[in-house]
């Protein structure tokens, strides 16, 4: 499979906003933010990052690939757990420095490595002047120990 090459973004704001060319604006580390939601019900599943190669693989294969900042490499989401993300639609924002993936999740229908459907399973609340986390989704679709051995 040939590697897609993205053209450099235009300095002209109107070209970024209105032209038909997809010219993603990667940050100084070569990454673009990816917001991921469920294609069916719109639930926010995760936020990740992509480099040019991960974005190209995602576009070419229809399966979500991301760049792991901690591991310093590309990973196909769900390759280990079986919870692959099939991309149904890709959108970009007005200045092309973020993308939005609408996906269908295979396997256990879980996106988070904790076994939950979404990585956003906690709310931030203020109790006695201290920010605290409250779990709002404790349902685990799989046991991470069984999948990752952690």
Curated annotation (Swiss-Prot):
Keyword list, A-Z: Amino-acid biosynthesis, Cytoplasm, Histidine biosynthesis, Hydrolase, Magnesium, Metal-binding, Zinc
GO cellular component: cytoplasm
GO MF assignments: magnesium ion binding; phosphoribosyl-AMP cyclohydrolase activity; zinc ion binding
Binding site for Mg(2+): 93, 95, 97
Pathway the protein acts in: Amino-acid biosynthesis; L-histidine biosynthesis; L-histidine from 5-phospho-alpha-D-ribose 1-diphosphate: step 3/9
Top-level taxon of origin: Bacteria
A matching Pfam family: PRA-CH
The protein's Enzyme Commission number: 3.5.4.19
Cofactor entry: Mg(2+); Zn(2+)
Protein's GO biological process: L-histidine biosynthetic process
Residue numbers binding Zn(2+): 94, 112, 119
Presence of the UniProt keyword Amino-acid biosynthesis in the record: yes
Compartments, as annotated in UniProt: Cytoplasm
Co-factor remark: Binds 1 Mg(2+) ion per subunit.
Main location: cytoplasm
Keyword Metal-binding among record annotations: yes
Reactions this protein catalyses: 1-(5-phospho-beta-D-ribosyl)-5'-AMP + H2O = 1-(5-phospho-beta-D-ribosyl)-5-[(5-phospho-beta-D-ribosylamino)methylideneamino]imidazole-4-carboxamide
Family assignment from sequence similarity: Belongs to the PRA-CH family.
PANTHER family reported for this sequence: HISTIDINE BIOSYNTHESIS BIFUNCTIONAL PROTEIN (PTHR42945), HISTIDINE BIOSYNTHESIS BIFUNCTIONAL PROTEIN HIS7 (PTHR42945:SF1)
Subunit structure: Homodimer.
Annotated function: Catalyzes the hydrolysis of the adenine ring of phosphoribosyl-AMP.
Protein name: Phosphoribosyl-AMP cyclohydrolase
Provenance organism: Rhizobium etli (strain CIAT 652)
Lineage: Bacteria, Pseudomonadati, Pseudomonadota, Alphaproteobacteria, Hyphomicrobiales
Gene behind the chain: hisI
